[in-house]
Regions:
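ATP/nucleoside-binding phosphotransfer catalytic cores, i.e., glycine-rich phosphate-binding loops
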Residues: 242-306
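Charged helix-capping and loop-helix junction motifs
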Residues: 28-31, 63-64, 221-226, 251-258
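Short internal beta-strands
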Residues: 44-47, 111, 235-242, 269
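Active-site histidine-anchored catalytic micro-motif
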Residues: 58-173, 181
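ATP/pyrophosphate-binding catalytic subdomain of soluble kinases
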Residues: 149-223
């Protein structure tokens, strides 16, 4: 199921389904809204955007956050839904999302980190292609600050370009070519769905993985969990993204993945265009891609927007 591409004059709805908005960082959101305005895009903030639960843990109750998701999908004037940021509690909204409403009103749905929970669940329940991308922030050189990200915001979401372009040189970790649908990206977020109806079907997929302030022990535990879930029996290859502040002077995340999965002999490619705090390629979650780890290329094969 495909959403419509963006056009000048469209309205983006911004929601906060995970961590609460921080007033001290308001300038980042203001800069983002101003940038969208300069691109001919209007912005609407959801009703419960500024809410916070009593623990200060989430941007309102699960009901408030789910209502904002459902309302944005119902709103005929909203063409895309972009999540403010990640955090921890996005999975609290899953049982409250009206997936039939989503099917009737397919829209661009975007975010990263804890928002991968929603990207994957929406794709699993409705087949909607969702997008792993930066937060709705400009001003700290972390999100929509990069020229590359601004370029691919336009080329992916307006022009529907199927190219995934390196922002710096990619590294072949294990040679090979394969095809499969993109599923990922943050292992903590993916594993929140384990044992639920929202867990992705990894059959014939390429697993995109990135970590945030992780370490070798944590990564090996997560890879073991995926192995016990049977994920590696289903996937066709792996693309490793940015591993922000990976806590090891001796080991790289991509080499740990390669060694752990040596028995499968997957094509594995290391890139830096998805994850935390670097340029973003706006990955279409659920779309089929051709991965050539040997020649260091990725090509989107499916249409991902109407």
């Amino acid at each position: 199921m495909l959403a419509k591409s963006l056009q000048k004059g469209d309205t983006i709805g911004i929601i906060a389904p995970s961590k609460p908005f921080n007033q001290d960082r308001k300038f980042e959101l203001d800069n983002f809204i101003e940038y969208m305005k300069n691109q001919g895009i209007k912005v609407k903030i959801s009703k419960n955007f500024y809410a916070s639960d009593k623990y200060g843990f989430s941007a309102g109750t699960p009901e408030q956050r789910a209502k904002d998701i459902n309302t944005m999908f119902s709103d005929k004037n909203i063409k895309a839904i972009w999540c403010l940021q990640g955090g921890e509690p996005a999975n609290q909204t899953l049982d409250l999302i009206d997936f039939e409403n989503v099917k009737k009103n397919p829209k661009l749905f975007m975010g990263k980190s804890d928002i991968d929970v929603l990207l994957l669940a929406l794709n699993k329940k409705t087949d909607l292609i969702t997008f792993h991308c930066c937060d709705t922030k400009i001003g700290s050189n972390k999100e929509l600050d990069f020229d590359y990200t601004k370029k691919w915001f336009q080329k992916r979401l307006f022009e529907k370009s199927k190219i995934i372009e390196p922002s710096e040189e990619w590294v072949c970790i294990n040679q090979g070519q394969t095809e499969g649908k993109i599923l990922g990206c943050n292992p903590i977020s993916i594993l929140k769905l384990a044992g639920t109806e929202y867990f992705p079907d990894f059959s014939n997929s390429i697993m995109f993985l990135e970590t945030y302030k992780s370490n070798p022990t944590e990564l090996i535990v997560q890879l073991t969990h995926f192995k016990q879930l049977g994920v590696f029996e289903k996937i066709k290859g792996i693309v490793i993204g940015n591993n922000f502040e990976f806590q090891s002077d001796k080991f790289k995340a991509e080499n740990i993945v390669n060694e752990f999965l040596e028995e499968y002999n997957f094509p594995i490619l290391k890139i830096n265009e998805f994850g935390h705090y670097q340029p973003h390629a706006f990955l279409p979650i659920g779309a089929k891609v051709k991965l050539d780890a040997t020649n260091k290329s990725i090509e989107i094969m499916d249409d991902f927007l109407n």
